[in-house]
């Protein structure tokens, strides 16, 4: 199934300006809070109206400003899962699933029974939302959406208010329950781990502007743009200048990089993820190293996070790899392996 979204909308704090098209089934939207992610979903669902553009699902036009097409939300065949699931508190599970369904009584009963079985809710039919766990509430909300047989499902940060353990558990449940759904799912989050795990393709938004759109794993591995690197979790990014085809100056790190690959002319920044440094001891100073001056350390259950000043560097070390540091002390330098250096613009 194909999906296209090309929209513009003026908002009080920024202008929403997006243009992407895909035939993948699982799409992620990543961005900081207030960057325009929820407004994008509301525009797709028909809750908000863009100032210009077009939205289509599998050839069906949901919105086209020039042609004056703007289908009402209830006619778009789009399911929208809100952050709080928006269940009716005084309705039972089966009543929530049946709410708003059209058709004969027999048809409604059949569709409700199908979703109760699909989402493993058969023993909970008479319970109310307040008597359900977070995972059960999520399944009821999804069952209500799926009873409408939508072409497109929109998930608006469904785990934002949950702790890390429950968030991981519910994400796994969500992926399992949607495994046999043939439509497109758009998953919005400010959590990069969630969108990496869920999505095949990823849209990154920053202050309403489309930073990039493409294969999720490729964007994490080769972000290319500074904003993409930052939003996918790169902790070490510094302004850089191309000196020639194989050399880059990084003044903030007091470093000149020598590279085998050709340096792109559009280069503006250099980055390296915090886990990718190689520690070096002794007075030897090979190419592509930064001096390491420990200013702070934070211990976490499975890793240490070291912070250097002059230059400002973050270095993360897994506890399973920490023995050498315990034996030899802090390294004098950190090496930037060329294959881990991010050349950005």
Locate predicted features.
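Non-catalytic connector elements of ABC transporters
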Residues: 5-32, 38-39, 46-49, 60-61, ...
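ABC nucleotide-binding domain signature
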Residues: 28, 70-72, 76-86, 186
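ABC ATPase nucleotide-binding domain helices that frame the ATP-binding cleft
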Residues: 38-41, 140
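Catalytic "switch" loops of ABC-type ATPases
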Residues: 47, 78, 82-90, 191
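A position-specific signal in ABC ATPase nucleotide-binding domains
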Residues: 48-49, 56, 102, 179
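Conserved ABC transporter NBD signature motif
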Residues: 53-65
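ABC ATPase nucleotide-binding domains
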Residues: 77, 92-227
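C-terminal boundary and immediately downstream tail of ABC-type ATPase nucleotide-binding domains
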Residues: 221-244, 271
């Amino acid at each position: 199934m194909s999906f296209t979204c090309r929209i513009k909308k003026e908002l009080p704090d920024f202008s929403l300006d997006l243009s992407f098209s895909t035939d993948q089934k699982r799409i992620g939207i990543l961005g900081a809070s207030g960057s325009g992610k929820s407004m994008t979903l509301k525009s797709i669902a028909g809750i908000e109206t863009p100032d210009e553009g077009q939205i289509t699902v599998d050839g069906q036009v949901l919105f086209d400003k020039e042609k004056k097409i703007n289908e009402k939300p209830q006619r778009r065949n789009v399911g929208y899962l809100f952050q709080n699931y928006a269940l009716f508190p005084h309705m039972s599970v089966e009543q929530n699933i049946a709410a708003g369904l059209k058709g004969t009584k027999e048809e409604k009963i059949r569709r409700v029974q199908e979703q109760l079985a699909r989402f493993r809710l058969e023993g909970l039919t008479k319970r109310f939302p307040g008597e359900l766990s977070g995972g059960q509430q999520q399944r009821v909300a999804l069952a209500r959406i799926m009873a409408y047989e939508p072409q497109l499902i929109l998930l608006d940060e469904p785990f934002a208010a949950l702790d890390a353990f429950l968030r991981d558990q519910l994400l796994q449940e969500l992926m399992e329950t949607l495994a046999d759904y043939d439509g497109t799912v758009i998953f919005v989050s400010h959590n990069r781990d969630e969108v990496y795990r869920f999505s095949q393709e990823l849209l990154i938004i920053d202050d309403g502007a489309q930073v990039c759109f493409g294969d999720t794993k490729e964007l994490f591995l080769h972000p290319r743009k500074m904003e993409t690197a930052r939003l996918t979790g790169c902790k070490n990014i510094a302004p850089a200048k191309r000196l020639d085809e194989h050399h880059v100056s990084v003044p903030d790190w007091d470093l000149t990089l020598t590279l085998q690959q050709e340096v792109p002319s559009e280069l503006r920044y250099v980055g390296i993820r915090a886990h990718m440094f190689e520690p070096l001891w002794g007075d030897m100073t090979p190419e592509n190293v930064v001096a390491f001056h420990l200013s702070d350390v934070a211990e976490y259950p499975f890793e240490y996070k070291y912070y250097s000043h002059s230059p400002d560097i973050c270095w993360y070390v897994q506890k399973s790899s920490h023995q050498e540091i315990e034996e030899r002390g802090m390294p004098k330098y950190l090496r930037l392996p060329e294959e881990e250096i991010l050349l950005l613009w």
